[in-house]
Each structure stands twice: as structure tokens, then as C-alpha cells.
Amino acid sequence: MYRKSFEGNHPLGRDRFADIVDKYGLKVRLKMRKPRTTDSTHGLSVFPNLIKEYIPLAPDRLWVSDITYMTIWTDAEHYSFCYLSLILDAYSEEIVGWCVGETLDAVYPIKALEMALCRIADVSKEDVNLIHHSDRGCQYASAKYVAILKEHGIRISMTEGGDPKDNAQAERINNTMKNELLRGMTFRNIDEVTQAVASAVRFYNEERPHMSIDMMTPKEAALCVGKITKRWTSFREIHIKENQSFCIIPENGLPLQPCPGLTSGLRPPVNPGQL
């Protein structure tokens, strides 16, 4: 490339050329591979999606969970991954459980779950009214994870396909964590990742206001009950509300009346205004 550009007017050896490229940062970094964090081909028991039309109206009614990867750079060219498990309260937007792990083993999501369970430690199993929603990854379908949820009276909900929108709120907190709270940070080991995540979670829960909870912080929203004014509403919630309003029958709507002449036995009501 050098010889073609300068036509050999300035002779340069291979090693000298490599030194110049290194000095001025001209090396092309290879595209980073992205690890797959969800394996839904495990053959373990899975559960139906319970939250398709569900909007929580109090804290600890719906937790959403997911796993994302974090990059660790050992030097300028070599990297590895660690994995962040997060559990978010869907009502207050509060991160209630998290754990950074070296592998995708279920032990790390379980640690995040155990952290979240401290919130309901004083609530009897009979009084728990909570849904845990996740993808169908082997970590969440593992026997131990499922057993812990059942032990605490928590209903289990899972996505029914590969569409990220089925777990959009969890996907969104992953994006916020990586591309906002930890943006521009470089990590050399898992301890640095853990410390940074701990600081980011504290800031997110206690200082960062959210338009989706009336510009409160998640810690403040966690003290509320009932509908919170939203200055920003997710597409999922808009869709649910539209479906619910579509299904509402007006008070003055006339019921279908029996009609012996039709196979169905029903006929549409007569609109009095047209008589």
C-alpha cells in the first residue's frame, strides 16, 4: 500500500512501516464479535407470557430481567467478556437486583434475583402478587432459578418468541446502562466492571429522573402506588391501552338480540336514530 502510494520514492522497511502505523494509531481495529447471551434451545421447561396486556400499578408487581455483555480489554487488541444480569421493577423503573459474572452460568442471575428478593423478605408467600418476566434463556429456565421463584410465590412469565419487544423494558435498561451510564469507559478486569456498575446503579436509582415516572427518580417512584403521570410512554403501553379502549363497550351500546332466522341466532341491534 505504501509503495503504491509513494511509488518507491521514499524507501521504507516493513518494521519501520509497522512502527509508524502503531505510533499514529493507524491500525484498523477488527470488528468486535458480540456474544450470544440467550440460549432458548435448551429443552428445559418454559412458561407463557403473562404480561402481554399487563401494566403494573404498584411496586413489586412486575420484575423484568435480562443479561447483557460487558467488554474487558486486556490490551489494545485483545478483549474478553463478562456478563451483567439485571432485574428492573417495571412500575418504578428501579434496578432491584444485579450481578456481574465471568460466565453465562445461572449462578449470577440467581445472585441478582437474591438481591431483588430482599425487597419482599417481610412479605408472606400468600401476600406476594408479583410476576417475574424474562426471555427463555437457559439461566431463567434452570431448575434452581424456577424453584426460587416458586418458593417465594412469584408467578413466572417468559417471552414467546425471539422478538426483543417482548421484553422491551429490560432491553432498554441494558441500553441505558451500557450506552449512557457506562459510555466511554474502558475496563481491564471484572472488578473494574463491578465497581462501575455499582456506581451506575446507585446514580440511576437515586439521582436520575425519568420522564416515564413524572420526572421522579426510581427510588421516589418506589414509594408511590397507583397510576403515575407519564411525560413519556413506551410503545408497548400505548398499544396495550389502545387495545383496552377498543374492547370497552359503551354504556349505551345495545346487546345483540336473538334472531331465529339466522344460523347464529343473533342479529345486529337496530340503531334508533335510523328509524
Feature map (PLM): residue ranges:
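Mobile genetic element proteins and their domesticated derivatives, centered on retroelements
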Residues: M1, F17, V21, I51, ...
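Basic, flexible linker segments flanking DNA-binding modules
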Residues: M1-P59, D163, T217-I228
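RNase H-like polynucleotidyl transferase catalytic core
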Residues: L30-R36, H132-R136, K150-Q169, M185-I190
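An active-site-proximal beta-strand-loop segment
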Residues: K52, P56-V96
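Anionic group-transfer/hydrolysis microenvironments
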Residues: T68, Y91, C99, G137, ...
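Active-site beta-loop-alpha junctions of metal-dependent nucleic acid enzymes
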Residues: S80, W98-S124, A141
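Acidic/histidine-rich, metal-coordinating catalytic segments
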Residues: S124-S142, E160-P164, D214-K219
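C-terminal domain-tail junction helix/linker
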Residues: A143, K150-I154, T176-L275
